[in-house]
Amino acid sequence: MSDVTVVNCPTCGKPVVWGEISPFRPFCSKRCQLIDLGEWAAEEKRIASSGDPSDSDDWSEER
């Protein structure tokens, strides 16, 4: 017997089975997936940083 993992859709909170049956996981639908993408694109969501913005002078792609 296999255990079924269920997560909540990050957009609407609906339960989503984590497996092949849910192609948009962790989202419940393409709609919720696109809503989330739109929030990231509009910079409504961001990853928190503990870095100091004044250290940005040291950020360089040149080594």
UniProtKB/Swiss-Prot annotation:
Its cofactor is Zn(2+). Binds 1 zinc ion. Pfam families: YacG. The keyword Zinc applies. GO terms for molecular function: DNA topoisomerase type II (double strand cut, ATP-hydrolyzing) inhibitor activity; zinc ion binding. Gene3D superfamilies: Erythroid Transcription Factor GATA-1, subunit A (3.30.50.10). It comes from the Bacteria. Keywords: Metal-binding, Zinc. The keyword Zinc applies. Zn(2+) binds at residues 9, 12, 28, 32. Interacts with GyrB. Inhibits all the catalytic activities of DNA gyrase by preventing its interaction with DNA. Acts by binding directly to the C-terminal domain of GyrB, which probably disrupts DNA binding by the gyrase. This is DNA gyrase inhibitor YacG. The gene is yacG.
